[in-house]
């Protein structure tokens, strides 16, 4: 019991095995380790956390696969660079471990790799244990998870993590067992076993392939082999049939790339019984692929044909045509207007173009279906003619990337955000305003030998699934693609650059060379955007992005090129080379599917993406890439362009001018961002709808909306919103009625102080200075009359007769209450009005503590409010180890730090010693609250709950 961590370990054991309410340090607590992304839990995340902080590691697992290595490849590379040693022991048991994975592990200089050879004498080998040593402590994860992608991300797995000193009995037994297995004569080093094992593995794979082939040959006719719709396709078909029964004639299928839109349409056509079908595309290659898909669904029972530049099968029942060919007058007029019962428009975001409009205006089918993964692609919209409008705002089914991954419709991807060379930034990527000499210099940087070598090294380390690489590389411009292709070829890769100038035949030939293994093979095709959509190349197993992210939509389009499932393809690798780009913040937005543009959500996904992403996919950023994204988030100032994009998209989708609450309900941009930029939603509408008739509001009406948007819209508490809601319907309400309503709706009783504070706030008294006091003194909403009832003012009643003003008030109430119920209507922490780990501004703290006015301008590191004291901490700040220094970059140098997940060390302000009134305000407060923000650029603080003081002592810095 003399170990320095004994007490912490005992507390951890008590929490884990005796009383879960017992407080203990998470670092010393046993845990149940399992996979459930909805709970933010994955075995992979636990492994990465332990690998990141360990001094050495030992792993003994029965099975290691290539996908398992891929999931851990970035952290393993980092450990190699740090020189952290590791020993990994696997086995030939069941010949399951993949030689490719073992080869990749053996490349790492810090890892010793052995294989335990099984036989009838020693029996099987089925261990699954991960041992991590950090200084004198061991973190050990033992259970059911092998080092396979499924086991550490997706499968139902049960593992236990224990924490022990080296002297602990269980740790000793585990370490001894590992040592015995490692030193066993049956354990061979990589060089000793690999050739023999590869031969053994190959023979085993040949047998398995023969068994699969034999099983396939048992299928003798088309009916037996008939394709069946997946879960997404079934839901789409059911919705479509309901729509048709209601007489709906147009609809959209919005489905993420790779989820099977073409097959979905074929199944729907089969179910609805259409005999004459037009399938319209914008490229020959896509028409050919669509025809093949339909043939797999219908077999030989339907006559199908192409109408393209080279094919003219006008007599077919199902026609697959290119828009360029069919839009010609002489070709259209070959058909009666009602010839087709169903017209299907692939990549329907192009339907606003004149050529599509010509075809759509000509035909009068019973039903028109549009299909796209990118309905909001802004460059495809023409004023007054957007995709939603074209298809009458009917969405038959929508499935986004996250949902598609949950449903296992896509190939898992492993995304790696890798730091590009320091020289790669926005100046290089966007050189339109530069001189010829500057452009030439930028071109040299983008195509430098150093960059070529760096890209090749990363691509070869992170690898691909399958026998050989079949990759796409996206570049900023075609000149760059051509030069990079030339240099890659000089260094041994087989690549080809393609552009829009290349013919369909050249493109088709390039794709054939890329995917087929028995012709003049290509490793990579380089392009700018011709592969961003449409072309179906399921075999793609690596995508390299050598350009800045221009939008989440384009990012997902390019990522999506690798997401189609294919035989012998277990996963796709996405390598994103991240330069110093201002748009880097769009990367986590695209990956997460979170369109709120909430900065904290963006940061969270960069740090914790692996615990949140569905399925076996993984997300990794190296440390410099993380910082580049964080900097892009911090430097994101004006959001007006993003607001406009979100507004336009939502308006198009709804077919009307959206309300503020619509953004919230449709998961568009965070309405709080709109208010920060425009002060009121009405002001934003006026800015957006310059050609639309938005009713004017009086100055006093605008003032009320601005004040309410600033104070109560965020929904941190509901009573002001609820009282306002009551006063929209009733001329007056009693205090008892108001109390009862709040109690019934929100489950808590307002005391008289809270009621008085609510009334004062709605009277305009929550202000920060004399200027605001004078400004908001004009707020005329309510009064307390002689009967002690809360009554609307007559001037407010007159304002309510204005429909636009009433509409805006209803919107504030609706959104504010929605937000309260979703974020703040939880069990409050020990009777205080704060929710653990939610975010609050200094203004919110004043608001929730019933302050008579906004004190946020005088709330710095500490504020005492009656019996409560609040500590406000900025966690990431520049510091110096020089104890004689008081300031860093003009700011006080505080040493605020988490010593553990339970103990926080806080420095008072300079010159505020232990006996100062400042310090005594903290020490003597009955309730003490800790609020932390990560960076100065953030406005809000995370509420980390109440704390007790363990020790008060002079700080290292003078007078703290």
Regions found by a protein language model. Name each.
Residues 393-471:
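Conserved interdomain linker/interface between the two RecA-like ATPase lobes of SF2 helicase motors
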Residues 203-229, 240, 441-442, 451-454, ...:
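Long, largely alpha-helical accessory region at the distal end of helicase-like NTP-driven motors
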Residues 552-557, 561-591:
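Conserved segment of the helicase C-terminal RecA-like domain
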Residues 350-415:
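Post-DEXD/H (motif II) to motif III coupling segment of the RecA-like Helicase ATP-binding lobe
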Residues 288, 306, 311-312, 331, ...:
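Conserved helicase ATPase core of P-loop NTP-dependent helicases/translocases
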Residues 1-230, 234:
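PLD/PLD-like phosphodiesterase catalytic module centered on the HKD motif
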Residues 690, 703-709, 719-726, 830-940:
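Acidic, glycine-rich low-complexity segments with interspersed aromatic residues
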Residues 245-269, 283:
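Walker A/P-loop
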């Amino acid at each position: 019991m003399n170990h320095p961590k004994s007490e912490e370990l005992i507390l951890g054991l008590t929490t884990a095995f005796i009383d879960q309410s017992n407080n203990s340090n998470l670092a010393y607590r046993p845990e149940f380790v399992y996979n459930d992304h909805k709970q933010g839990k994955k075995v992979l995340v636990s492994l990465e956390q332990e690998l990141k902080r360990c001094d050495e590691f030992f792993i003994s697992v029965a099975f290691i696969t290539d996908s398992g290595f891929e999931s851990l490849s970035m952290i393993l590379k980092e450990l190699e660079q740090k020189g952290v040693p590791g020993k990994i022991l696997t086995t030939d048991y069941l010949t399951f471990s993949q030689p490719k994975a073992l080869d990749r592990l053996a490349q790492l200089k810090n890892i010793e790799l052995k294989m335990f050879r099984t036989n009838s004498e020693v029996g099987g080998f089925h261990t699954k244990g991960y041992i991590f040593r950090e200084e004198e402590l061991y973190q050990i994860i033992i259970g059911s998870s092998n080092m396979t992608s499924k086991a550490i991300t997706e499968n139902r797995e049960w593992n236990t993590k224990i924490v022990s000193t080296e002297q602990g009995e269980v740790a000793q037994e585990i370490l001894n067992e590992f040592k015995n297995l490692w030193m066993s004569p049956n354990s061979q080093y990589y060089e000793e076993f690999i050739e023999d094992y590869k031969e053994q593995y190959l023979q085993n794979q040949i047998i398995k392939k023969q068994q699969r082939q034999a099983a396939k040959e048992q299928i003798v006719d088309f009916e037996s082999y008939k394709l069946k719709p997946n879960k997404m396709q079934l839901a789409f078909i059911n919705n479509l049939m309901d729509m048709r029964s209601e007489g709906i004639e147009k609809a959209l299928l919005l489905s993420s790339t790779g989820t099977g839109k073409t097959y979905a349409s074929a199944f729907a056509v089969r179910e609805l019984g259409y005999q004459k079908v037009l399938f319209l595309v914008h490229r020959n290659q896509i028409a050919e692929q669509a025809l093949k898909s339909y043939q797999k669904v219908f077999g030989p029972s339907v006559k199908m044909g192409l109408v393209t530049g080279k094919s003219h099968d006008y007599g077919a029942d199902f026609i697959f045509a290119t828009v360029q060919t069919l839009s010609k007058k002489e070709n259209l007029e070959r058909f009666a207007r009602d010839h087709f019962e169903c017209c299907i428009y692939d990549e329907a975001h192009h339907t606003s173009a004149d050529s599509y409009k010509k075809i759509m205006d000509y035909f009068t089918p019973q039903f028109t279906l549009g299909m796209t993964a990118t309905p909001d692609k802004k460059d495809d919209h023409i004023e007054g003619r957007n995709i939603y409008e074209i298809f009458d705002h009917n969405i038959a089914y929508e499935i986004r990337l996250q949902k598609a991954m949950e449903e296992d419709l896509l190939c898992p991807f492993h995304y790696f955000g890798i730091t590009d060379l320091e020289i790669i930034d926005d100046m290089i990527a966007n050189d339109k305003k530069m001189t010829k000499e500057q452009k030439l210099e930028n071109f040299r940087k983008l195509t430098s030998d150093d960059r070529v070598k760096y890209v090749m090294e990363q691509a070869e380390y992170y690898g691909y699934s399958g026998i050989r690489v079949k990759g796409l590389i996206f570049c900023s411009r075609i000149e760059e693609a051509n030069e990079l292709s030339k240099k890659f070829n000089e260094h041994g890769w087989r690549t080809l650059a393609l552009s829009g100038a290349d013919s369909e035949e050249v493109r088709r030939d390039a794709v054939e060379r890329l995917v087929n293994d028995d012709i003049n093979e290509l490793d990579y095709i380089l392009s700018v955007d011709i592969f961003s959509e449409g072309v179906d190349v399921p075999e793609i197993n690596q995508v390299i992005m050598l350009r800045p992210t221009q939008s989440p939509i384009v990012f997902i389009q390019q990522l999506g090129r690798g997401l189609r499932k294919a035989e012998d393809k277990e996963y796709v690798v996405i390598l994103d080379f991240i330069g110093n780009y201002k748009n880097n913040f769009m990367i986590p937005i695209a990956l997460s599917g979170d369109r709120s543009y909430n900065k904290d959500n963006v940061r969270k996904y960069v740090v914790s993406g692996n615990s949140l992403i569905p399925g076996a996919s993984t997300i990794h950023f190296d440390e410099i890439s993380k910082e580049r994204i964080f900097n892009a988030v911090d430097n994101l100032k004006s959001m007006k362009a993003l607001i406009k994009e979100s507004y336009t998209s939502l308006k198009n989708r709804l077919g009307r001018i959206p309300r503020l609450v619509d953004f919230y309900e449709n998961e568009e941009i965070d309405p709080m961002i709109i208010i920060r930029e425009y002060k009121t939603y009405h002001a934003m509408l006026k800015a957006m709808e310059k050609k639309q008739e938005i009713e004017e509001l009086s100055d006093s009406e605008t003032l009320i909306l601005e004040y309410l948007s600033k104070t109560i819209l965020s929904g941190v508490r509901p009573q002001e919103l609820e009282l306002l809601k009551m006063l929209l319907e009733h001329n007056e309400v009693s205090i008892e009625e108001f109390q009862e309503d709040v109690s019934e709706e929100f489950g808590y009783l307002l005391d008289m102080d809270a009621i008085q504070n609510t009334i004062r706030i709605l009277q305009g008294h929550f202000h920060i200075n004399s200027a605001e006091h004078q400004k908001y003194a004009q707020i005329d909403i309510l009064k307390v009359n002689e009967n002690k009832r809360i009554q609307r003012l007559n001037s407010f009643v007159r304002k309510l007769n204005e429909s636009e003003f009433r509409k805006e008030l209803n919107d504030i109430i609706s959104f504010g209450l929605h937000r309260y119920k979703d974020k703040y209507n939880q069990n409050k922490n020990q009777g205080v009005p704060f929710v653990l780990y939610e975010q609050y501004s200094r203004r919110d703290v004043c608001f929730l503590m019933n302050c008579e006015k906004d004190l946020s301008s005088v709330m710095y590191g500490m504020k005492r409010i009656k019996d409560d004291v609040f500590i406000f901490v900025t966690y990431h700040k520049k510091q110096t180890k020089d104890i004689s220094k008081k300031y860093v970059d003009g700011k006080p140098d505080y040493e605020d730090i988490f010593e553990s997940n339970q103990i926080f060390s806080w420095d008072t302000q300079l010159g505020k010693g232990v006996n100062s009134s400042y310090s005594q305000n903290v020490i003597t407060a009955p309730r003490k609250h800790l609020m932390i923000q990560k960076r100065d650029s953030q406005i809000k603080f995370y509420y980390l709950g109440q704390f007790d003081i363990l020790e008060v002592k002079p700080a290292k810095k003078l007078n703290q």
